[in-house]
């Protein structure tokens, strides 16, 4: 017994000596160190505690049931706003019944066909939330395993209409607490003007409400029908999660929602094996002060989102013209709201939106100072250095254009780079574990991931003054 105790003492002494020999300089980081111990801890806890053992999971299959059918047919639904408004939409939802009436346009029908309803990325709800949605009330609890949404295809691209970039499906038993089922798979025959998004689950889930979230690609998305297949049942099935899921709320403006940065982030993390769910609270040109003000549309929406959902992370991004004197008072109000929700506040150190490339380093320096000071003052240890990554990429790979045609907003390429920086910063995802390329050439995507890593490890060489 004494020998065992002595051996254990020697082991602990060896470990202590080793740890003491490691200096802070052994770890290279950006200007603010990132402590991901909470993330690792949560992943470990989830794998051992939160995920139910496979043998305890309720596994019900329903496709062979004689009553299996599209249970959303002719059911009532709610949708987000149309464009330019619900009173005079360009592509209306006649009588609020077209999306579940069972009537589909032909594969050759025009986008103006009466079976289509149009969602636009410039509608108020889309700008605020980052998606348009249709929420079907099935009237009572059902067991469900297949979800379909019919949309116009990319055949209409010449007029600014395309298939959605993605359709994500959620279910709820009460219309308040939502469970994300996942992203639907796009199917479309060659030459067809009608496509569909399909999501099938291995086993049935229970729900009375089904929500289809449509994330845009071009400005317009034409939606023809939504379906949910299953059977009526009063048995509630506990929702099963096979992996840990982190929920993120992104607060900001077009620097966040242009080219769907949060959804690119979601695809990147999931390609690396980390499940995420994203929600937006954004508005074009918005300042954080407007979200902190509970009397504004943005402030009211943020309060609603914080009251309805517990988030793991809340990402904060301010207007390009904001300096510390603007951001600090807003953060004084926002941080207590974030902490009350139980979320971890993190920062998106924005890139320069100056349309003159020669002025971008000095403009980015202003953001660098502002966000780093905010991080220090509010003890925020995760500050995604997107500003650094843009400048590093411009230095190393000047042929890669990160900006949109307006030379101010980021492009789809810039969105991918931004999302990579956030995935690596917030969730400690390794550059080599990311397999999603966002339809970019593999070598270009690899270069962007490299720039993201460099931005996090060493940062851009900003001048001290």
Regions from the PLM with identified roles:
Residues 9-18:
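Bacterial N-terminal signal peptides
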Residues 18-37:
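Sec-dependent signal peptide cleavage junction
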Residues 58-68, 238-271:
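N-terminal module-boundary/linker segments of secreted carbohydrate-active enzymes
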Residues 59-69, 104-182, 193-240:
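Aromatic, loop-rich ligand-recognition surfaces of beta-strand-rich domains
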Residues 60-109:
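Predominantly extracellular/luminal regions of secreted and cell-surface proteins
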Residues 247-249, 257-330:
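Conserved SGNH/GDSL esterase-like catalytic core that processes O-acyl groups on lipids
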Residues 336-345, 380:
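A short helix->loop->beta-strand "cap" motif at the edges of active sites that frequently abuts
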Residues 364-456, 460-462:
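Catalytic His-Asp segment of secreted/periplasmic serine-dependent ester chemistry enzymes
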